[in-house]
Amino acid sequence: MKKQDNNMTRRDFIKTSSAGLAGAAILASPLGPLAGRALAATAPNLAIEKGATLNVLRWSVFVSGDKDLWEANCRKWEKATGCTVVNEYLSWEDVRPKAAMSAAVGAGPDLVLGWHDDPWLYPDKLVDVTDVAEYLGAKYGGWEDACIKYGVKDGRWIAIPMGAPGQQIVYRKSWADEAGYSEFPKTTDEFIKCCKKLKSMGHPVGFALGHSVGDGNNFAYTWLWSFGASTVDKGGNPAIDSPETRNALDGMKELYSAMIPGCASWLDPHNNKSFLAEQISVTNNGISIYYAAKKDPKLQNLAADIYHAELPIGPIGKPTQLHLFDQAFIFKHTAVPNAAKHFLMFMLEKEQAEPWMDAMIGYVTPGLKDYRNLSVWTSDPKNTAYRDCVKNMLWNGYPGPIGPGSAAVMAEYVVVDMFANYCARGMSADRAIERAEKSIARAYRR
């Protein structure tokens, strides 16, 4: 979008941002074979409800720059439109139940920044945002495949992908060097060896095997898939009872032997705190640990020693990453649907999105392909590992369908608990898999 002149009138701004923008780009269409076609980047004509108050529910931040620029961009939108934005920030695990309650009762926030396949739990309650999604995709190089998988149902966009608070490997460079790994391992086999060597040197690792919304689920699914295992097959039938799952369990148990005590009960903040306290040498996390160290004058030596690497690749031989995935969706009970759609369009235009990315040093990886070229990914080489999170991401029900089943399996921590039961609670592999299989079958029957 053309940068706004400070003297532009509110009416001019709305007219320009709603109808006058045009350009050419390639849009990854919501449905497979159309993916290469070019569409004109013409913004939808949205008649914003006069004096609208937009109530937004979103997850609380782990890096202050996220909130600072989010709020600043909200004030820009308010000034330009004459509307008001009220943001409510909740802990990550509290967003899903509150959004579900709002969907059930038909009241509450107008717009929610939720997780993964939340919109698939109540698609009939949501405003169609196809016009906004196709405009943004056309203008900014198309959407990554995972965005289309999550955002499109029955040929229409039910949510706007905001991006992924990605997770990669965070490690202490000097300790890895001492262990003989000047280049951090890229495969699960070498990764396990490295972590065990670090533990033997007095530098244990730490990975959440508790009910951790982000770090626990993401690492468990990534690890499972990397061995060629999955919760279900393409048809949504339970597939967890397999030799590949047993290999994944054994690999995780080896890794668990290198972990600091207590990981089986860790939630999302625990590995951040342990890493910053120099109690662990390796974990999976967003860029928030590095961000926190950089911002603290007392932790500058630690910040210099923090490096990032992509999640290790398992026997399957290719990236199998899962990341937290943030989707914005609008409830039909809102009285201001056009304001809500315009707000999302505005927030993902480059003029707002790029400063937001810069302020949080890439904590959220965008789903629009052109945003892989933002300077934030190369201005500090330590940010680069997070650039392709959405590009390399699978969906949480992979390789099966997205829907209530995949959402329930993740929300109930079925995969995380399977690993924790085997690694930390003395359960046999057969028993851990059996319990997981029953939970998966129940979830997909709902």
Language-model features: locations:
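Short, polar/charged alpha-helical segment
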Residues: 43-45, 63-82, 415
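Extracytoplasmic/periplasmic solute-binding protein
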Residues: 154-162, 167, 192-238, 280
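Glycine-centered hinge/linker elements that transmit conformational signals in sensory
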Residues: 194-201, 235-264, 307, 311
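Extracytoplasmic "Venus flytrap"/periplasmic binding protein-like
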Residues: 72-143, 152, 174-186, 274, ...
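Long, aromatic- and glycine/proline-rich binding clefts that accommodate carbohydrate-like moieties
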Residues: 143, 306-310, 358-414, 421
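N-terminal secretory signal peptides
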Residues: 1-12, 25, 34-35
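Conserved C-terminal helix/tail region of periplasmic/extracytoplasmic solute-binding proteins
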Residues: 47-48, 84-85, 177, 393-446
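Hinge/lid segment of periplasmic solute-binding proteins
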Residues: 41-48, 115-168, 192, 219, ...
